[in-house]
Amino acid sequence: MAHHLAKALMSQHEIINIYSRSFDKAADLAQVVHAKAVSHFKQLNADVDLVMIAVSDQSIPSVISALTEYLPNVLIVHTSGSTALSVLSTRHARAGVFYPLQTFSLERDIDWSNTPLFVEATENTDLQRLHTLAESLSQRVYSYSSAQRLSLHLAAVFACNFSNYCYDMAKQVVDAEQVDFSLLQPLILETAQKATQNDPKQMQTGPAMRQDQNILQMHQLMLVQAQRADLAEVYALMSQQISQRHS
């Protein structure tokens, strides 16, 4: 996320420093966004408006504890969907959140203008600053609480991470028979469009919703015969859940 955020922000904002545990990574990104890489928090320029922490959730507490020693008066925000504002605010007075609800892969560019951005802060003036900053990137900016943001993060795991794993399983099935996975692309895109334009429950189709036991059993047998007990287990669980949801 740090790479994408820095590149997006540099077009309208000056980025002063980049820090990473790996100085080489910091230097590479700093070169891209015309900033100065540093190898220690004490080297960070204290005369800045904002510091962003874009690290793993478990690293946030230790990072903010170290940062506040050198930047006691600077607004510091994290970019996590699942970490409460209090993780920062209990350690630093001027704390905030700047969370983009998006999936990031280094090799893919992001359409920031349509990416929802969620901001939160301990002080109203800082909240407005974050709102203004977010609006420089996206048309969809929201002031959400930590609890609301966490619910979105949980929902995103279902909508993004789990669905992508389903695509992975689908590819494994067709790869085993030398069938081109791209043949499923129109189906995948139509499913996503229907789910975003309608109530997903009302758009459910398939043998589990119809409770077509002949098809369900045939698919299960195919997976068992292919020695894919792992896929058979997922198929059975999801079919059961869909059937119960529509019974």
Indicate residue ranges for each PLM-predicted region.
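NAD(P)+-binding Rossmann beta1-loop-alpha1 motif at the extreme N-terminus of oxidoreductases
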Residues: 1-40
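Short, well-ordered alpha-helices that flank and scaffold nucleotide-derived cofactor binding pockets
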Residues: 3, 7-11, 31, 65, ...
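Hydrophobic/aromatic beta-strand patches that form the interior of the parallel beta-sheet core
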Residues: 19, 38, 52, 77, ...
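Short, polar loop motifs at secondary-structure junctions
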Residues: 21-25, 80-84, 124
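Internal alpha-helical scaffold of NAD(P)-dependent oxidoreductase catalytic cores
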Residues: 25, 29-32, 109-155, 159-196
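Glycine/small-residue-rich loop that forms an oxyanion/phosphate-binding "nest" at active or ligand-binding sites
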Residues: 44-45, 49-112
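NAD(P)-dependent Rossmann-like dehydrogenase/reductase catalytic/cofactor-binding core
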Residues: 182-247
